[in-house]
A protein has these predicted regions:
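ASCE RecA-like P-loop NTPase motor cores
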Residues: 1-685
Length: 685
């Protein structure tokens, strides 16, 4: 076979024109608008990549037309294939999407354009899912879960599209898989069969609509080992195995996996006192089984080879993970951490290329995301940010505005921020997208007044929460965005990911150096990773910037047309994070609020107690909050709020009294026994 040297200029121009044609047609059908010149440039570079095979990362912003381009590129490619154009012989496509529903949707779209296409044109490879049954691929309505699928033994097997897709996968011109399936096949070393179409000498183009895990990470914990045993136990009923055979494998895991794990758990400690033999955990460092007995290594090797060969049916997900880590420990050093539960980390080097395939990854935040920092890939141009003239970032810098998980546990925080939310909704028009921590998402709607609640975009009956809105376009009517929290990972996770993804930065040597410095004097202190390993802080800032940008772009900014001003509210972000976000939204207005809002100050005061009782300020504020606006004699107020005369006098003299009255639009009138609280004719803003 003559080596492929790339498309000619004429061929690339022709293909690019067909992609542009389909982009225009798709935009016409759904009323969308995209930057055609930008996508023409991206198309040209992708086609050039068929020759050099250098992996490409496209940082097209959210809402810029990524999904439209992917569909248009596939339509143009399928048109070539159906017309028997020689261009279609130099590539095929492996499409990796997050959701099965999206795969099925693209298949339907292509079928609408090419009604009589062969079944091998587009194949969405999938197991049983609710989506596959909804699409009519599974004909057995009695099956309601993946575990119930009997595959070839099902009475509907002959007409099952799910099984048929598996049979057609190798022949498919466009083969679609979910990201979860791709990761599973990759970890199981079973990916090679998908990288090339049968009877096509050239490898597939791999298109990912979102970032995937470039470095498969394996974690060995006590939970992993327990899960391995439980999953083996379930095989007895799932695969009708004899208990004796499963018990034999569980016994092997005790000897070959649990025992070395427990040994390392014990050895990753420092003795504090020779007399009492008291010990303390080493927070993090390196461990290994290289010096283990050769007989143990050999027994483990036999077990590993058995699971990879004749015993593959017993290789459950948790057992596979445990075996991967132990195998690495016998071959060299691994990172361990005790910042949480004892964890041993096994990971491959980050990889974005597979075989000779051209890889194209779409990721709107790739330019800021730390996972790309040391990745060997070409970063394509970003699309121009849209609607920046409409955007205003409101950044509250006061320490009282801290919205970390720990800070939000304070009793006054949630009521205070709900009051601030109501104030924002009074000042600005439009719907609000608020995202927060999962445990707060259900509480916020309960604390808002009905008018404010009616303008809050909910996910069911709760607010959206971090990690629960991935890929969602459901909030693109919002013109107000409130980020009540930060989607931080655990310190242990940041340490692990920096270790894996920033290996070329020197982080691994820093960790090894720190390992040698642990002593009885410092090992008992809570480790300050940001001080000991500054690179972990840099990685964390990049991660947060990428995640927050994703959340901000769920509003009207992602739309082709943005008629309203967009206001985004951030609370006490770290300075480095604030700076990175500012660079990502160049052209937007930025307002830094240095003072603590009055409603937050009041919420703090309301929560204060003295000798177990509410303070005078809190009691008077509570009375004002339920006041019916009718003129009320002071004597009645003091009686109802249980405030003594002397306490009232002290409150009157305090600097907080006048602002509290102003907040509720109240004033004091009269003298002596005729003093009243009345509503002002004009309230303060």
């Amino acid at each position: 076979m003559v080596p492929f040297s790339g498309l000619t200029a004429v061929q690339m121009a022709f293909m690019a024109d067909r992609v542009m044609y389909y982009i225009e047609e798709l935009c016409r059908r759904c009323g969308a608008a995209v930057d055609f010149e930008y996508w023409r440039k991206i198309t040209k570079r992708v086609l050039e990549g068929l020759a050099d095979r250098k992996p490409l990362v496209c940082p097209a912003r959210a809402g810029s037309g990524k999904s439209t381009w992917i569909t248009a590129f596939l339509l143009a490619a399928c048109e070539l294939r159906l017309n028997n154009d020689p261009l279609a012989d130099v590539f095929s496509v492996l499409l990796v999407l997050q959701k099965i529903e999206s795969l099925n949707g693209i298949r339907d779209t292509i079928a609408d354009f090419f009604t009589n296409a062969p079944e091998t044109l587009v194949v969405p490879l999938q197991g049983w899912t609710a989506a596959s049954q909804k699409a009519g691929f599974c004909k057995n309505k009695q099956v309601t879960s993946f575990d119930q699928c009997r595959k070839d033994n099902c009475p509907y097997a002959a007409s099952c599209d799910v099984l048929r897709f598996g049979q057609l996968a190798g022949q498919a011109f466009v083969l679609g898989v979910s990201q979860a399936r791709f990761d599973l096949l990759r970890k199981g070393n079973a990916l090679d069969g998908l990288l090339q179409q049968v009877e096509n000498a050239h490898p597939r183009i791999l298109i990912f609509d979102e970032k995937f895990e470039f470095a498969p990470i394996y974690r060995l914990t006590q939970t992993t080992l327990d899960a391995a045993s439980s999953q083996l136990e379930r095989l007895i009923t799932q695969r009708d195995l004899k208990d004796r055979r499963v018990f034999e494998k569980q016994r092997w895991t005790t000897t070959l996996l649990r025992r070395p794990f427990s040994l390392l758990r014990e050895h990753t400690c420092i003795e504090l006192d020779e007399t009492t033999k008291a010990k303390a955990d080493i927070p993090y460092g390196r461990c290994s089984l290289v010096d283990a007995d050769n007989a143990e290594k050999e027994r483990f090797g036999q077990f590993r080879d058995y699971l990879n060969g004749p015993g593959r049916a017993f290789r459950t997900p948790a057992l596979s993970e445990a075996v991967e880590v132990i195998d690495r420990l016998y071959r060299g050093e691994c990172l361990f951490t005790k910042l949480g539960a004892f964890t041993i980390l096994g990971a491959d080097e980050p990889q974005i290329s597979f075989g000779d395939s051209l890889t194209l990854v779409f990721d709107a935040t790739a330019q800021v995301d730390g996972d790309y920092q040391y990745l060997d890939a070409e970063m394509l141009p970003a699309s121009k940010p849209r609607h920046m003239e409409k955007l205003c970032l409101h950044v509250y810098t006061s320490a009282d505005m801290n919205v970390s998980r720990l800070a939000m546990r304070k009793s006054w925080k949630l009521p205070g921020f709900c009051a601030l939310m109501e104030d924002i909704l009074r000042r600005y028009e439009g719907k609000m997208f608020l995202t927060t921590y999962k445990d707060l998402a259900a509480e916020i709607p309960k604390l808002l007044d009905p008018q404010a609640l009616s303008r809050l975009l909910l996910d069911g009956e709760t607010c959206p929460y971090f990690g629960g809105t991935n890929g969602s376009n459901e909030f693109n009517t919002a013109s107000l965005v409130m980020l009540l929290g930060y989607p931080r990972l655990s310190p242990q996770t940041y340490l692990e990911r920096t270790f894996v993804y920033w290996g070329h930065s020197g982080i691994r040597q820093q960790i090894w150096d720190q390992t040698a410095q642990w002593s009885p004097l410092n090992v008992q202190k809570r480790p300050d990773l940001h001080a000991q390993l500054p690179l972990t802080m840099d990685y964390e800032v990049r991660h947060l910037a990428a995640r927050l940008e994703q959340e901000i772009y769920r509003c009207q900014l992602r739309n082709a047309v943005c008629d309203e001003a967009v206001h985004v509210f951030l609370f006490a972000p770290p300075q480095a994070l604030d700076a990175r976000l500012g660079k990502r939204f160049r052209g937007a207005m930025s307002v830094h609020e240095n003072l603590t809002p009055g409603c937050i100050v009041q919420a703090q005061a309301n929560a204060k107690t003295y000798a177990g009782q509410s303070t005078v300020y809190a009691r008077f504020a509570a009375w004002l909050s339920s006041w019916d606006r009718a003129p009320t004699p002071l004597d009645n107020i003091l009686r109802d709020a249980e405030i003594g005369t002397e306490s009232w006098k002290k409150l009157r003299k305090s600097g907080r009294f006048a602002p509290l009255l102003a907040q509720y639009g109240a004033e004091m009138t009269g003298r002596g026994r005729n003093v009243k609280i009345e509503e002002k004719s004009q309230k303060c803003a």
